[in-house]
Amino acid sequence: MYETNMYEGMIAETVTMQGANGDTINAYYARPLGTGPFPGMVLVHHAPGWDEWYRETTRKFAHHGYAAISHNLYHREGQGKSDDVAAKVRAAGGVPDAQVIGDTEGAAQWLRAQPWLNGKVGVVGTCSGGGHAFLFA
């Protein structure tokens, strides 16, 4: 529960991690300041792409005491505006489920390797990310 006298510092940054097939992809993570331990949460983005909403939501989880990571499922298609990259992915037929699951496993492993994690990792997604979170679980 939120308390008005809570300290609200956090760390948030873009990191690289190992995804499916050993590919290096980027991810955005946030966690509260301090040594933890914190529970982990993996956020699987929606079909419109790895956008600002996922960064905001990653920080929101950190605000509530989680170490959260949102990995870029479209990293292999290049960088740019999320709408443009998502359109490119859709035109190519989307991302195979096996690749999404492999990338999501990589994000969970990245969290589990951190010294401030308490060992617990959940997964959440919206839109197609919700379906992928279900497949992953």
Please name every model-derived segment:
Residues M1-Y2:
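Non-catalytic accessory segments flanking enzyme active sites
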Residues N5-M6, T14-W116:
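Serine-hydrolase catalytic machinery in alpha/beta-hydrolase-like enzymes
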Residues M10, Y74, T126:
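Histidine- and/or cysteine-centered catalytic micro-motif in compact active-site loops
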Residues M10-T16, G130-G131:
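Short structured motifs
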Residues E56, L135-F136:
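Active-site signature of alpha/beta-hydrolase-fold catalytic machinery across serine-
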Residues F61, F136-A137:
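Aromatic pocket-lining residues of Rossmann-like dinucleotide-binding sites
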Residues Q114-T126:
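Alpha/beta-hydrolase fold nucleophile elbow
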Residues G125-G129, A133:
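Gly/Ala-rich beta-loop-alpha elbow adjacent to hydrolase catalytic centers
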